From Swiss-Prot:
Gene expressing this chain: petD
Protein name as it appears in the record: Cytochrome b6-f complex subunit 4
Key words of the record: Chloroplast, Electron transport, Membrane, Photosynthesis, Plastid, Thylakoid, Transmembrane, Transmembrane helix, Transport
Membrane association type: Multi-pass membrane protein
Species in which this protein is naturally found: Marchantia polymorpha
Subunit details: The 4 large subunits of the cytochrome b6-f complex are cytochrome b6, subunit IV (17 kDa polypeptide, petD), cytochrome f and the Rieske protein, while the 4 small subunits are petG, petL, petM and petN. The complex functions as a dimer.
Amino acid sequence: MGVTKKPDLSDPILRAKLAKGMGHNYYGEPAWPNDLLYIFPVVILGTIACTVGLAVLEPSMIGEPANPFATPLEILPEWYFFPVFQILRTVPNKLLGVLLMAAVPAGLLTVPFLENVNKFQNPFRRPVATTVFLIGTVVALWLGIGAALPIDKSLTLGLF
């Protein structure tokens, strides 16, 4: 059974502290130093303890040791680099491939300027941002799936 501290709401000093709102917790105590020095370290140390505990109790296998004398048939990057790898693999000019990769973040940076007059949060009322998101997602998935396939089937995904 735990003891909980109930605030005395009839106290005018406490009511004044609670009326201030931000910077105070439920009991009217200021966030500094109570919350920052006593609660946050417990949460941070608890998170670290859970992470270390999971790492000790369930260690994952690193994999087979590397052999410098055996090269795999096709070298594939990590899964999150598949779309970029596919761009570099399919574009004949490597400079054009690098420029296409640089065009992706540059294009994403222009979207807010194309639709700066639209202040709606509903995606159906923001057609430019929704269209850019949907086309970008489809292209990224298409390039990512194609990168895992052989080069002759990578652009058509083996469907045609």
